[in-house]
Curated annotation (Swiss-Prot):
GO BP: translation
GO cellular component: cytoplasm; small ribosomal subunit
Domain of life: Bacteria
InterPro entries, alphabetized: Ribosomal_bS16, Ribosomal_bS16_CS, Ribosomal_bS16_dom_sf
Keywords, ordered alphabetically: Ribonucleoprotein, Ribosomal protein
Similarity remark: Belongs to the bacterial ribosomal protein bS16 family.
Protein name: Small ribosomal subunit protein bS16
Gene Ontology molecular-function annotations: structural constituent of ribosome
Length: 76
């Protein structure tokens, strides 16, 4: 199954996340199909960018979003 979730990039104690489309069987930081945005929780205000067109496309194809990505997409 295809899922839309966060993958962590960034250094120790300085998280930065990429919003990616991946297979649900892959590890959190494993390979991904497409990167559709990013999330920086350390900046003030929190920096969120998600490509709405690509998000809608992947949801239309049947990809499921993680809970965190659903919350972030409402804020973006």
């Amino acid at each position: 199954m295809t899922v839309i979730r966060l993958t962590r990039i960034g250094r120790k104690k300085k998280p930065f996340y990429r919003v990616v489309v991946t297979d649900s069987r892959k590890r959190r930081d494993g390979g991904w199909i497409e990167s559709i945005g990013y999330y920086n929780p350390l900046s003030e205000p929190k920096d969120i960018k998600i490509d709405k067109e690509r998000l809608d496309y992947w949801k239309g194809v049947g990809a499921k979003m993680s809970e965190r990505v659903e919350k972030l997409s409402q804020k973006a």
